[in-house]
Amino acid sequence: MRTEDSTGVPFAVAGSVNGGRKFIMEEMKNIADIKLELTLKIEEDFGLNSIHIARIDGFFNIVHARAGAPYRSQHISLKDILSKTQKDFCFERLRGTLVCVYYPDYMDGINASGWHMHFVSEDKKLGGHVFEASFDSAECLLQKMDRIEIQLPREAAFDTYSLKEASQDEIEEVELGKG
C-alpha cells in the first residue's frame, strides 16, 4: 500500500524475499496450521535460531485481520491505542499475499517471538495484521534472514519512556487480536 513519504509508522519489519525455498502449502484450515507448517519447514531446512520471512500467495477462503487508525501519542501503549482505534475485518474468498515474519525466542524484546503475519489483497486495497486465515492451496516462498537493522526514534521522548511495561499476556492479546 502506498502512502505519503511523510507518513510515519511506530514500528515496521521489512525484508526482501529473493530466493529461499519455494513450496506449495495444501489445505490450511486456520492460522495455527499455517504457523505449524512454516515452523516445520524452518526446522527442516534452517533451524529456529534465525529470523525467517515467508510470502504466501494464493486464494484465501477467509482472513480475519485488524488495523489501527493513525494515532499520535508518545506515552500510550499499543494495547491501549488498539482498544481505541482498532478496526477488525473479515475478508472472504479473495486473492492476496500473507507476509509472515518469524523471530526466535531469544530475540523476544526486540520483537514478539514466533510468527507475526500481515495480509494484503491482490489489488492492494485490503489488509492488516492477521489473527486468523485459511486457504485450500497456496504458494509459499520461505527465506532465512541473515541480518537485522534497527533504527531507533530520534525524539527525546524515546530516551525517557519506559518501554518494558507490556507483559507477555498483553503482547499475546495484541498479536492474537484479543485486546
Predicted segments, located by residue:
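Hydrophobic alpha-helical segments and helix pairs
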Residues: 1-42
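Long, positively charged binding patches that form subdomain-scale interaction surfaces
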Residues: 28, 32-110
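A generic structural signal for well-ordered coil/turn residues at beta-strand boundaries
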Residues: 50, 92-94, 111-113, 126, ...
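Mature extracellular or lumenal effector domains of secreted proteins
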Residues: 96, 125-126, 174-177
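Conserved catalytic alpha/beta cores of large enzymes that bind or transform nucleotide phosphates
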Residues: 163-179
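Short, solvent-exposed amphipathic alpha-helical segments in soluble enzyme
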Residues: 70-72, 115-116, 134-135
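Histidine-centered divalent-metal-coordination microenvironment in nucleic-acid enzymes
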Residues: 112-120
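A hydrophobic, small-residue-rich beta->alpha segment in the mid-to-C-terminal subdomain
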Residues: 121-166
